[in-house]
């Protein structure tokens, strides 16, 4: 998750509305040339301007390791999450899971 103001994209994107685990929905944004899904805005996070960014779309994507896996109850059986400590059947409480510096940075952005 990053703050919307911290994202800069080269090129054009389009978007579509999709369902989400919360039931509130999300808007997914994708490259108009190749169709790759880049990020989404969850409707429940709109007031905070948080977006979920697909880190593999970044030039330096290897710097970003997952800190949590969500909705693992719906994962495909061939996905192996053994060894990952932060796996959740549904969403998690970010105050309990996120690193303190990430929570602080988010709070600074939304205040």
Briefly describe each language-model feature range.
Residues 1-111:
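A short Gly-Trp-Pro
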């Amino acid at each position: 998750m990053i703050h919307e103001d911290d994202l800069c994209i080269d090129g054009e994107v389009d978007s579509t509305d999709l369902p989400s685990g919360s039931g509130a929905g999300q808007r997914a944004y994708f490259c108009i040339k190749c169709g790759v899904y880049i990020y989404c805005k969850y409707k429940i996070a709109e007031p905070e301007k948080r977006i979920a960014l697909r880190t593999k779309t970044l030039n330096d994507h290897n710097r970003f390791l997952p800190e949590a896996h969500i909705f693992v109850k719906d994962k495909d059986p061939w996905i192996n999450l053994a060894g990952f400590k932060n796996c959740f059947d549904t969403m998690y409480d970010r105050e309990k899971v996120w690193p303190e510096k990430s929570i602080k940075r988010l709070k600074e952005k939304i205040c």
